[in-house]
Each structure stands twice: as structure tokens, then as C-alpha cells.
Amino acid sequence: MLSVLEDLKSSHIIKGDERHAFRDPAVLYKDGVFYIYFTLVETEADGTVYMYTTETRTADLTNFTPIKKLTVRDRRYNFSSPGNVVFHDGKYKMCLQTYCRENGEKFGNDNSRIFIMESADLESWDTPYPILAKGDTPLSELGRMIDPYLIYEEKTDVWHLFYKQNGVSHSTSHDLKHFNYEGFIDGGENVSVIDVDGGYYMFHSSRNGIGVKFSSDLHNWRDVGEPLTFGQKDWPWAMGRLTAGAIVELSEGGKPLYLMFFHGTGPEDESVIFDTHAGIGVAWSFDLKNWFWK
């Protein structure tokens, strides 16, 4: 895999344009193939904007399968921002959001919620169903929730769900059906979490760049270092904002190799460019401290 990364011409692997933005990547690595899921923001000929959860696959981060839409064309839902894909109870489960813009809003309105979508084979996906992240609180009373992410804690047999609400909110579950609310911490959107030697690193979107936190128990977190911005200062395509990091662990020569997928907007920031031009990039590290990019 290291040779694949070294042979990359650019870290900018999926490029947006005046009608398409590619945002919020989530990545599953299976049998030598990257399954890259992301938000497609598509501006139609009449200027109407629709959002989808989409997929492409690649073995070399250079040649990609055609982008496949996995969710419906409906601004009341705008299924998007896949957090990650986990395997549980015989099925692959993807957590994702609705980003409701049915009235022409720029950002998702208060109807936005978080969902799970299931697949037996990674080829076809069932209709998403909502996550009731606060126990018996009805869906209509949960408030705006976006950007979910799931991680399993083996020693306690507990699933941890992180999502954007009042900072980074946190719920837990034993079965991915019934959840208990655990509270929230300071932090941004697009959380991604990885287990490293029994500790946990959280990556989240700061105002610009990818913030890093550490925890030994998935409940108490502290900030680590400065936000990651990789080669942003030299990348016109990401000079406006670099964000939404998704971490994946591989192995290289028996040692960990971490890939960080993210999206960038530029040269203007997201106050100017939001529904167009955003693209997906990649950086990599052997220790989560020293990063490489092209």
C-alpha cells in the first residue's frame, strides 16, 4: 500500500466542479479495495441542489469505479455525510444523516436527524431507518442531529455513537437498536474515532483543519496538538477550508499505516463555495503524528 501512496500524483483524488461537490468521506477497506462513501452535492440544470450518499471503489486511489448513488433524490431527506460502515449481526451498517433543505435552505434545517442503512453484501442497501439516540425521546423531539459515527468497545461490549449536537454528543448501545444518551463534549462535526493500543483518538472538524482529541475510555477527552491541515497552504482546491477527516488503519510491513481521507474547498471558503467544487483528498501517517501527502 505504501507504494500506491508514493505513486500518487496528487493527494487530491476526487475532484469537484461547478455542478458537483464531494464531501464528508467515509472509507471501508476490504479485500484490497477501498470502498469510499461520501456526500455528493449535485446542482441540477435549474439550479436546484440535491444531496446523496454515494460510493466509488478503488484499489490504487487513482482509478475509480463510476460514482453510484445509494440514496433517494429528495430534498426533504438529502441523505448524506456517511460516518462509517461497521459489520454487526450479519449485516453491514452505515450511519448517515439527513440534511433537510426542502425550503431551499443553504444548511440542513431542524428536521435533520441521524440514520442507519443496512446491506448484506455492500451491493444493495435497504431504506435507512432513524437512530433514536436518546432512549425513549421521540424522533420529533430529538432536535437537529448530524454527522454520526459508530465505534465498538470490545472490553465492554458497547457501541458508542458520536454525532454533532451541542458540540459532540455521545450515546451508547448494546445492540445498535436501543441507545442511551451519555452527554456531550466540546468539539466540531464529522467525528471519526480509532482505537490505538487501548486508547482512542478522535478527529473532528475545527473551524479549519482536523482537530484531534484523545481518550482512554471514550467518555473523557483532551485535546492533542494543533488541527491537521496537511498541504493546505499549497493546495488551491483546499485553501478555503480543509475538514471532515475519516481515519482508516491498514498495515504496512506488520506496522500500522493510517490513511486520513478528508474534503477540501477552495480557493474561497465555504461561505462562498458550499454546494460546488469541494473535493476529496488523502494523507497518511505511521504514528498519527507525522503526516505525508502529495
Q: Where does each model-flagged region fall?
A:
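Carbohydrate-active catalytic/glycan-binding domains of CAZyme proteins
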Residues: 1-294
